[in-house]
Amino acid sequence: MATFKDTCYYYKRINKLNHAVLKLGVNDTWRPSPPTRYKGWCLDCCQHTDLTYCRGCTMYHVCQWCSQYGRCFLDSEPHLLRMRTFKNEVTKNDLMNLIDMYDTLFPINQRIVDKFMNSTRQHKCRNECITQWYNHLLMPITLQSLSIELDGDVYYVFGYYDSMSDINQTPFSFTNLIDMYDKLLLDNINFNRMSFLPVTLQQEYALRYFSKSRFISEKRKCVSDLHFSVNVIENLHNPSFKIQITRNCSDFSSDWNGVCKLVKDVSAYFNVLKTSHIEFYSISTRCRVFTQHKLKIASKHIKPNYVTSNHKTSATEVHNCKWCSINNSYTVWNDFRVKKIYDNIFNFLRALVKSNANVGHCSSQEKIYEYIKDVLDVCDDEKWKIAVTEIFNCLEPVELNNVKYALFNHEVNWDVINLLVQSVDKVPQILTLNDIVIIMKSIIYEWFDIRYMRNTPMTTFTVDKLRRLCTGVKTVDYDSGISDVE
């Protein structure tokens, strides 16, 4: 059983404040919820289990039981998960406030220990102190957290997470902030709490405390498309698709890391809860993570033989050709922007190949094909530049004054002509490697300009940011018919 979950369940009964703050979905009646997909720690109840996606940020960080409350660590309502979430620069004073909150919600003193032990000793067999019966008294105060970086903002979700070595398929990684506080001071706080426990439980408490307070922080993970709801991923091919999210909000305003101080003033906390409400947002899918997902899918269906062909139609419109026809039934081609990029990239590359190589049919086997498969995924800049460089070398460029040039005298379509004029100010007859890089990036940036994209979607914005964008109608950016350049 998860220690944090058990502790919330038992401590919820001791007073009115705890009854409001420590209410977890995992301790209530189970309700239908979205299917689980990954394994990790539920941020709400801290147990290691199968996770489903959060309705507030679409990432997988909540269990099926806790999903009924729809709590997200990015909410503005001061529920327990939000009060345990700190952001960016965490000071020693912030950590003191967190420890005070823990001590307020989960006190250990003689009265509390006697109360729980008396309620547990219902039968003769329960006279001895067995760990599983007193799990709720064995949660030490630590500075253990799960952290995540979202476009420059680092969030720390503090809690007590059991079994740290278990499989973790989420973008969160364990971080220990004890060095930012004071080890001896935290030791003293826990030793004082431990002193009220029976001797047989003190050893288990100490073991748990030191194992969760002396660990080495993990390397922070990179957020990828795999960490977001499969429902979102399956609809990325639709340019007009918007992500629907809900956030738990309140009228309370405070610095982000100061919310945990609310529990010190019970009346103020309940006044804030009276203003609690849910806000709905429609969010654009525009970000690097989702853009790269689409470009990677398209890359899997590339037919490189088109660059040596003589087809009169664009690359996505070739039919009945064994070497050049793509399968238009894949959903990735439903996004006209991906088709435009594919057509223009291959129209430009075919002009380069036809200008520099003596290849007359798409059935021929050429070395250049193996590098063309990576020309769409511009998000992986290093790999993309290597692919373009190898393509350039396959053209057997002529070197003049230590600069290599390739001919460019084959016809291209009007879209490519316009992009040539925009990127190099003319329709050139010869091109350097740098010119080719600029032109190919311009073709992709016309629709997906990753230079000005967030890495993660706006579903990972805080409520304050979402409200500011919503007032300017910017949460749904770029209509389906408008490119990034326009």
UniProtKB/Swiss-Prot annotation:
Annotated protein name in UniProt: Non-structural protein 1
Region (Interaction with host IRF3): 317-486
Species assigned in the record: Rotavirus A (strain RVA/Human/United States/D/1974/G1P1A[8]) (RV-A)
Main localisation: host cell
Location of region: Zinc-binding domain: 42-79
Task performed by this protein: Plays a role in the inhibition of host innate immunity by inducing the degradation of key host factors required to activate interferon production such as IRF3, IRF5 or IRF7. Associates with components of cullin RING ligases (CRLs) including CUL1 or CUL3, which are essential multisubunit ubiquitination complexes, to modulate their activities. Recognizes the host NF-kappa-B regulator BTRC through the presence of a DSGXS motif in the C-terminal substrate recognition domain.
Motif window: pLxIS motif: 480-483
Assembly description: Interacts (via C-terminus) with host IRF3; this interaction leads to IRF3 degradation. Interacts with host IRF7; this interaction leads to IRF7 degradation. Interacts with host CUL1 and CUL3. Interacts with host BTRC.
This protein's UniProt keywords: Host cytoplasm, Host cytoskeleton, Host-virus interaction, Inhibition of host innate immune response by virus, Inhibition of host IRF3 by virus, Inhibition of host IRF7 by virus, Inhibition of host NF-kappa-B by virus, Inhibition of host RLR pathway by virus, Interferon antiviral system evasion, Metal-binding, Phosphoprotein, RNA-binding, Viral immunoevasion
Domain remark text: The integrity of the zinc-binding domain in NSP1 is important for degradation of host IRF3. The pLxIS motif targets host IRF3 for degradation; however phosphorylation of NSP1 pLxIS motif is not required for its activity.
Motif annotated as IKBKB-like degron (ILD) motif, chain positions: 479-483
